[in-house]
């Protein structure tokens, strides 16, 4: 992109980010669910699980996030630590995510919370804030602890295992909620990470929108594409590159490549 075009693109992204990053965005987005809670552990649990099932139709995602909160009886951390999930009957949570997958996830979280006061504390102990790729380092640590809590078994429905290639869209989205703190949509309860360290939550819609805008050349929506796109956005806002996740969402709707 030439200098003039870069300036135009930045102005477009800034304008769209300001429009979408507003209180009105919350009501139709999965971020509404962790925002209902005040205790950090509750926020972490609901942020992770809401992000985990955040694929497909947004109305269905939100409906099934409500289902999770009902299962937890409105007290996620207490529910996890009581081990109440072990008696859940088989059933579907969201699309290809079933109760057996939920149990795997909650066993892992229970193991973590039995050793650390918060998931953030575990992240610090695992060196996540010092890593150049914090989301991938976090998932590596969580996968290891989840496997320990599940007889050595991993579950790709819960967390990806192919960390060399995965875009980690859902964990990067959860980290956006947990780390960014502008007092509007994202909650900023994690202080060990800075917004400048975050990476864009990449999916097919973000990828297509970014290519249409000339922000991304790579054709695959993988880890390398996340790095390339985030580096481009970081040149616009070194302190907060993922603010442009809102812009790419809004512009994606406008050009017909994002979920409604």
Go through the PLM ranges and name each one.
Residues 1-260:
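HhH-family (HhH-GPD) DNA N-glycosylase catalytic core used in base-excision repair
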């Amino acid at each position: 992109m030439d200098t003039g075009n870069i300036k135009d693109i930045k102005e477009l992204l800034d304008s769209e980010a300001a429009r979408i990053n507003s209180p009105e965005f919350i009501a139709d987005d999965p971020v509404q669910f962790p925002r209902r809670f005040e205790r950090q552990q509750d926020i972490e649990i609901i942020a992770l699980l809401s992000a985990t099932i955040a694929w497909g139709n947004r109305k269905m995602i939100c409906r099934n996030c409500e289902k999770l909160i009902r299962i937890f009886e409105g007290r996620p951390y207490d529910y996890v630590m009581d081990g109440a999930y072990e008696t859940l009957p088989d059933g579907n949570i969201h699309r290809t995510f079933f109760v057996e997958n939920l149990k795997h996830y909650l066993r892992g979280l229970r193991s973590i919370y039995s050793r650390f006061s918060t998931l953030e504390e575990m992240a610090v102990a695992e060196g996540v804030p010092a890593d150049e790729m914090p989301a991938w380092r976090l998932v590596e640590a969580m996968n290891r602890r989840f496997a320990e809590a599940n007889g050595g078994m991993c579950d790709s429905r819960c967390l990806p295992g192919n960390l060399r290639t995965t875009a980690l869209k859902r964990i990067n989205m959860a980290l956006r909620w947990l780390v960014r703190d502008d007092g509007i949509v994202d909650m900023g309860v994690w202080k060990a990470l800075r917004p400048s360290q975050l990476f864009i939550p990449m999916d097919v819609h973000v990828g297509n929108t970014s290519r249409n805008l000339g922000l991304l050349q790579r054709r695959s929506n993988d880890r390398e594409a996340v790095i390339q796109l985030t580096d481009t956005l970081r040149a616009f806002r070194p302190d907060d590159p993922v603010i442009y996740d809102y812009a790419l969402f809004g512009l994606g709707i406008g050009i017909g490549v994002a979920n409604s």
